[in-house]
Amino acid sequence: MENVALPLFYQGMNRRKRNALALEYLDRLGLKDWAHHMPNEMSGGQKQRVAIARALITQPQIILADEPTGALDSKTSVEVMQILKDLHKDGMTIVVVTHESGVANQTDKIIRIKDGIIGSIEENLNHNASIFGVNGGAMK
């Protein structure tokens, strides 16, 4: 919980209020029961959700998600991408940086950058596809 509440500490919020908000955000991400666990007791997906809660707690206008599924198993990757999609549906701007085409293909727009130069910008009409292909099956 302290990890999620940390940005509010730097904003000068009192401990009681920041802990209450941290617990609320952990609950939204399905981690309320894990609020007092240490990071070494959590899975990669749980840690990623903690990071998302920490990013959201200050109610930013934009989230920069750098390789949000990089160290996750396939099931947890789908869950994390669904969280990001839900946030986007709620009006938040999400910028996903990834090397994985399956992750990029879930976004509304794909901007390809090579050597620091924008190569192409594409509207992604298939952005509702699963991370593992249009039909949701595992890629072969």
Predicted features and spans:
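Conserved ABC ATPase "signature" region
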Residues: 9, 16-33
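Conserved signature/switch motifs of ABC ATPase nucleotide-binding domains
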Residues: 37-40, 58, 90
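Catalytic Walker B motif of ABC-type/P-loop ATPase nucleotide-binding domains
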Residues: 63-66
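Helical segment within the ABC ATPase nucleotide-binding domain
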Residues: 78-90
